[in-house]
Amino acid sequence: MSRISQIELDDRNLPPPTPEIEQERKVAIFDLIEENSFVLPKRDERDVPEGPYHLSLSIREKRLVFDVQTEGGDKAAEFHLSLSPFRQVVKDYYQICESYFTAVKTLPPSQIETIDMARRGIHNEGSRVLQERLEGKAEVDTDTARRLFTLICVLHFGG
């Protein structure tokens, strides 16, 4: 199965992330590189270069850009996704993450667990939206979609 072997976020124009967001980002990238599934389907009867792939994620002109290259540096694909379908779920995810980070410092474990369950539910929704938006462009499994959604959140809210 094809996979992502390297990932880069184009965050040059973003403010520095908070320590919590930077940690989430590092974990998502590490986990993504360790295990993922990323397949470029055949399009218009044209063959697609085989992976592993290098993926660059960026936001350009209010669109999420997936720039996919082979390990040899050849262009494998590039696709642009509207950010509109992600706006509400990203906003909800950040709000629940703020609550979670605050709860970890002050609340008992039972309340932290409740907030964490809500956080996971919103994260799952974001990964589902991503899988839908990637349909016909790239095939990703649920864990890969979850990790990519985390990175989209970092880009979407600018750290």
Curated annotation (Swiss-Prot):
Membrane as UniProt keyword:
no
State the superkingdom: Bacteria
InterPro entries given in the database record = UCP032146
Q: Which UniProt keywords apply?
A: Plasmid
**Pfam family name, one:** UPF0262
Which stretches does the entry tag as region Disordered? Answer: 1-21
Q: Which family does it belong to?
A: Belongs to the UPF0262 family.
Q: Under what name is this protein listed?
A: UPF0262 protein TM1040_3562
